[in-house]
Amino acid sequence: MSERRVAMDLPSGSNASMPLQRHRVSSLRGTRSPSSLDSPPASRTSAVGSLVRAPGVYVGVAPSGGIGGLGARVTRRALGISSVFLQGLRSSGLATAPAPGPERNHATAEDLGGCLVEYMTKVHALEQVSQELETQLRAHLESKAKRSGGWDALRASWASSYQQVGEAVLENARLMLQMETIQAGADDFKERYENEQPFRKAAEEEVSSLYKVIDEANLTKTDLEHQIESLKEELGSLSRSYEEDVKVLYKQLAGSELEQTDVPMGTGLDDVLETIRVQWERDVEKNRAEAGAVLQAKQQTEVVHVSQTQEEKLAAALSVELHDTSRQVQSLQAETESLRALKRGLENTLHDAKHWHDMELQNLGAVVGRLEAELAEIHSETEQQQQERAHLLACKGQLQKDVASYHALLDREESN
């Protein structure tokens, strides 16, 4: 009996490949309808005996309700019958006295029907006991809750505590967000400060170089002022010497007189004319010498005046050049400051652009990482589904092989 399989032919509308064990619980939970399994042994024997077929061992159509409606070829494992139960069945008088041929199969079917009826009776009794215990337990819990005065006060305190905890969690999250924002701002300012340090050093170096240029310009200015003072002193000394020379010349011209001749004049006309000619030539030579001296003094005066004019022009040109140089230095300083401001603005713009670019790259990287994680998860799910499908196909093939082997075994038994 342990080596034999018992098959049942149920209505064609039911699934022929579904095991009975899978739907046993659902069928037992429903309301049982009257069936031949709940009927007396005599009627059950007649119902089973009317549906027996030869030469195989088959159990006919079961009534609706109970285990009816589940058409399947079942084994003792599918029926949930333990080996102990079957051992007890084998130890009974019905199993020890098998009848040959159809009578043996009929007796085996009757024994199996009786075992199933007893099993169903025990199951329904256990279900009723379980329902009664559940009802008693529920009533006990309700009475205990009523005696304790209800859960409204505790529920209200629990709700208030839950609300306070939720508010505290939200406040903590808000504070954490503020701290993260402040920390991010501090890190940003620190990074900007560190980035501005090289530019600050470069600006300080430029300012120090400009201070050196200004010091050199001040030294040049002082030197030029000293040169102008020395030129003014030299010009004053030249003008004083010129005035003294002019005064000496004026005195010389004012104190000069005609020289008297000591030569006696003759009495004749020729002697008188000769004397006048000699005196005239002498006066002409004297006047020529005086005119030459005057012209030479005038030329010297003009040279001194010209040199004085050139020195004044040189001093004026130097002062104008100094003024232009200072003005150019001031304009260069203003232009340098404007260029520094422009440079700082461009550097800040570049830094902001780099910062936003890095933020965009980080956001895109996070999105790409999330998409890659989702893609990997989808791949893993797909592989898992493929493995499950392969496993199900393998199980299907194995079940088909088992069914074929069962059919072959039953056919061999029928042929025997």
UniProtKB/Swiss-Prot annotation:
Its main location: membrane. Residues 28-48 have a biased composition (Polar residues). Residues 105-416 form the IF rod domain. Residues 2-115 are annotated as: Head. Belongs to the intermediate filament family. It is found in: Cell membrane; Cytoplasm; Cytoplasm, Cytoskeleton; Cytoplasm, Cell cortex. It comes from the Eukaryota. The modification N-acetylserine is found at S2. Residues 1-48 are annotated as: Disordered. It is a peripheral membrane protein. GO terms for biological process: cell maturation; cytoskeleton organization; intermediate filament cytoskeleton organization; intermediate filament organization; lens fiber cell development; visual perception. SMART domains: Filament. GO terms for cellular component: cell cortex; cytoplasm; cytoskeleton; intermediate filament; plasma membrane. Keywords: Acetylation, Cell membrane, Coiled coil, Cytoplasm, Cytoskeleton, Eye lens protein, Intermediate filament, Membrane, Phosphoprotein, Sensory transduction, Vision. This is Phakinin. The gene is Bfsp2. Required for the correct formation of lens intermediate filaments as part of a complex composed of BFSP1, BFSP2 and CRYAA. Plays a role in maintenance of retinal lens optical clarity. Expressed in the deep and shallow cortices of the retina lens (at protein level). The modification Phosphoserine is found at S27, S33, S36, S91. Transmembrane segments: none annotated. PROSITE patterns: IF_ROD_2 (PS51842). One of its GO terms (molecular function) is structural constituent of eye lens. Gene3D superfamilies: 1.20.5.170, Single helix bin (1.20.5.500), Vasodilator-stimulated phosphoprotein (1.20.5.1160). Residues 397-416 are annotated as: Tail. Residues 199-240, 314-391 form a coiled coil.
